[in-house]
């Protein structure tokens, strides 16, 4: 899954918590209402949760507060160390959306700010895999940067460049940010009913339930 980004996140691990709390002007709007976004994912998660890309463990903490059983799947070694230090009682293992070794089927797959590391074809493969690894009635609850149309994405890139936000513009151009229609098709094709809720200018909450549940 986009393991080409591992080195970037190993480096970012040192300042990630400062970025998400609004201390980086370029990413301030991306992480606007970050805490509420995490709360929205937590509120929809139930039962045994497999969390992809826990990073420094911020969503993990909220899931723990709710009393949920969690396993974290994190490809960045440095991020794993930080998350494990914050939450020593949580199992956080190496892996990614397409490669994870969890014996028990999950009630919820949860993730924030990570699904865009996969190409659309990889996203399709991941959602197909998730359908086989969820319990009956299971769900996927993700929050990530998504765009309503490809044109909206290009406009956001132009705006970032005009504001001198070179890192943000490069991020939007090089990672695999997709559109709501593309994601809707992927979920529907793989047996999920999905809804989208806009959380800020960049991030949407995706709540997908297995059909027939």
Label the predicted regions.
Residues 1-44:
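Conserved class I S-adenosyl-L-methionine
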Residues 47, 107:
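Conserved acidic residues
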Residues 52-99:
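Class I SAM-dependent methyltransferase SAM/SAH-binding core
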Residues 110:
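A conserved beta-strand element that flanks and buttresses the S-adenosyl-L-methionine
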Residues 113-114:
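Short catalytic micro-motifs in class I SAM-dependent methyltransferases
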Residues 124-136:
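A short glycine-rich, Lys/Arg-flanked "PGG" loop and its adjoining helix->strand segment in the class I
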Residues 143-190, 196-197:
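C-terminal alpha-helical "lid/dimerization" subdomain adjacent to the S-adenosyl-L-methionine
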Residues 190-213:
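Core SAM-dependent methyltransferase catalytic element
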């Amino acid at each position: 899954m986009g393991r080409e980004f591992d080195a970037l996140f190993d480096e970012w691990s040192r300042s990630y918590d400062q970025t998400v709390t609004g201390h980086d002007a370029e990413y301030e709007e991306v992480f606007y209402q970050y805490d509420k976004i995490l709360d929205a994912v937590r509120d929809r998660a139930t039962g045994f949760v497999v969390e992809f890309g826990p990073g420094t463990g911020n969503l993990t903490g909220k899931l723990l507060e709710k009393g949920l059983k969690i396993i974290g799947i994190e490809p960045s070694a440095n991020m794993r160390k930080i998350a494990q230090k914050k939450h020593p009682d949580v199992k956080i293992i190496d892996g990614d959306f397409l490669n994870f070794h969890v014996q028990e089927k999950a009630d919820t797959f949860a993730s924030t700010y990570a699904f865009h590391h996969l190409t659309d074809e990889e996203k399709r493969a991941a959602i197909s895999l998730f359908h086989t690894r969820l319990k009956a009635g299971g769900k996927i609850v993700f929050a990530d940067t998504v765009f309503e149309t490809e044109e909206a994405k290009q406009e956001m890139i132009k705006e970032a460049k005009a504001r001198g936000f070179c890192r943000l513009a490069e991020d939007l151009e090089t990672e695999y940010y997709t559109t709501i229609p593309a994601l809707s098709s992927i979920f529907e094709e793989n047996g999920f009913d999905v809804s989208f809720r806009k959380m800020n200018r960049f991030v949407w909450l995706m709540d997908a339930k297995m059909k027939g549940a």
